[in-house]
Amino acid sequence: KAVALAPAPNPEGSLSRYLTDIRKFPMLEAQEEFELAKDYAKSGDTKSAHKLVTSHLRLVAKIAMGYRGYGLPIGEVISEGNVGLMRAVQKFDPDRGFRLATYAMWWIRAAIGEFVLNSWSIVKTGSNAARKRLFFKLKGVKARLGMLDDRELSPLETRQIASELQVPEHEVTDLSRRMIGSD
């Protein structure tokens, strides 16, 4: 039932059109958001949930854009983020005093992160928690060092990253190759 609350980016459609379309949904004032969340929590009113979800679709798109470098279709990343947003709306307790966006960021990132991990061959071939942490740390270090292009790392770059992450160079090389899709 909740999956129908958010419009999904059309894989055949234009991402820019989707981003334009979601801007048409108004952002909510704190009081209106609180009242809608109370209505949904009390009665399960899907109209209230729909308003809460659609008013936060820009947040999902913004968070999803941070995952562009993983080589996954951004429309699918946004769709997974939308699932996280809907889950956040379902679980949100307005009486705790926080705005929905603050709470939803965690659920959106969790849904997208899970999608990214499930989409990568390193996870499909059996991964452990340390490998998953290395996956995300490598992405962050490459971004910080300005190595966002999809190319193999030079031996110097590999040594630099391995030293910073305190892992063997072969792990950095292997993971980096998987991230650029040459596995």
Task: For the regions a language model picked out, list residue spans one by one.
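Short intrinsically disordered, low-complexity coil segments enriched in acidic
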Residues: 1-4, 183
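Long, charge-dense, solvent-exposed interaction surfaces that engage phosphate-rich ligands
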Residues: 142-183
